[in-house]
């Protein structure tokens, strides 16, 4: 029988690779003693049987395909399943909303949906302001925020144009008035901020 001290000594002389463990019987790693011991429980037997069935099916289906392509194939299937789908209630709500829109609103919505700020220019602008490099994720987030901001300003400018009884090609005066109206709402920061001394 091996004492704890002898086992430590043998472990120091012959280090085991990570992930391998000693078996309870004779110190042979569990991963390597498949022929020496019988399976301990039926779960491991079922798992190995399932694995064998899966690998046999893969070998029969595509024997000439390299293993990396098989892995990529299964990864893409998993990603497709995880993609969130729109439920029926949400789809009904969207169709109701689209049917209520006028042609002008629908075309404006489509243009707004397709538009985007160039990420490279946003990143360059942010880098010139901060003096540090900007990650791609930060540039993408800032481009999204800028798109929302422009949408709010344009929507407010259209409201101003309608209130003044003018037709929709927006003019600079409409945009200026929209920005002036958005400042008190807290959407725009105050650019003329003066530090109060006392």
From Swiss-Prot:
Region described as Disordered: spans on this chain: 1-90
BP-aspect Gene Ontology terms: RNA polymerase II preinitiation complex assembly
Biased composition (Basic and acidic residues): 1-10, 37-50, 72-90
GO CC annotation: transcription factor TFIID complex
Tissue: Expressed in fetal brain and testis.
Signal peptide: none
Pfam families in alphabetical order: TAFII28
One GO MF term attached to the UniProt entry: protein heterodimerization activity
Similarity-based family: Belongs to the TAF11 family.
Protein name, as recorded: TATA-box-binding protein-associated factor 11-like protein 11
Species this protein is from: Homo sapiens
Taxonomic path: Eukaryota, Metazoa, Chordata, Craniata, Vertebrata
């Amino acid at each position: 029988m091996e004492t704890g001290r002898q086992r430590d000594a043998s472990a120091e002389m012959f280090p085991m690779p990570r992930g391998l463990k000693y078996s309870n019987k004779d110190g042979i790693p569990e991963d390597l003693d498949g022929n020496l011991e019988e399976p301990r429980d039926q779960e491991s037997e079922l798992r190995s049987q399932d694995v064998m069935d899966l690998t046999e099916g893969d070998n029969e289906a595509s024997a000439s395909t390299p293993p990396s392509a098989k892995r990529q194939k299964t990864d893409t299937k998993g990603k497709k399943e995880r993609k969130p789908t729109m439920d029926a209630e949400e789809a009904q709500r969207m169709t109701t909303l689209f049917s209520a829109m006028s042609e002008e609103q629908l075309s404006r919505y489509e243009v707004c949906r397709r538009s985007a700020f160039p990420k490279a220019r946003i990143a360059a602008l942010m880098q010139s302001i901060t003096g540090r490099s900007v990650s791609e994720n930060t540039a993408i987030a800032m481009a999204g925020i800028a798109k929302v901001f422009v949408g709010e300003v344009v929507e407010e400018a259209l409201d101003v144009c309608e209130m003044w009884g003018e037709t929709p090609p927006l003019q600079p005066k409409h945009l200026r008035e929209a920005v002036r109206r958005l400042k008190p709402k807290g959407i725009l920061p105050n650019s003329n901020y003066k530090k109060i001394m006392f």
